[in-house]
Regions:
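Conserved RNA-binding domains used in RNP assembly and mRNA/RNA metabolism
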Residues: 1-78
Length: 78
């Protein structure tokens, strides 16, 4: 299921799989904000490959996992 993950590193959208100690996000997109609204970064950090297959975040660094706004979900799927 596609979810929004807010971590100490930033906000991500993707297919979430929660383990005991980690959250794995498949097809992750990092959310970025500008004066014109929101968008998606090309990678998940400055030096990552563009559009990585997945990212693993330690649960200690996850602030929350929530349902994604339908409009944002539509933009993610495009």
């Amino acid at each position: 299921m596609i979810k929004t993950v807010v971590s100490t590193y930033g906000e991500f959208i993707g297919e979430v799989d929660e383990g005991a100690d980690v959250v794995v996000i498949k097809k992750p997109k990092m959310v970025i904000q500008s004066e014109k609204g929101f968008g998606f970064a090309k990678g998940v950090c400055v030096t990552s490959v563009s559009e990585p297959e997945e990212v693993t975040i330690q649960k200690a660094n996850v602030v929350m996992v929530v349902d994604t706004n339908p409009e944002v979900l539509k933009a993610y799927e495009e």
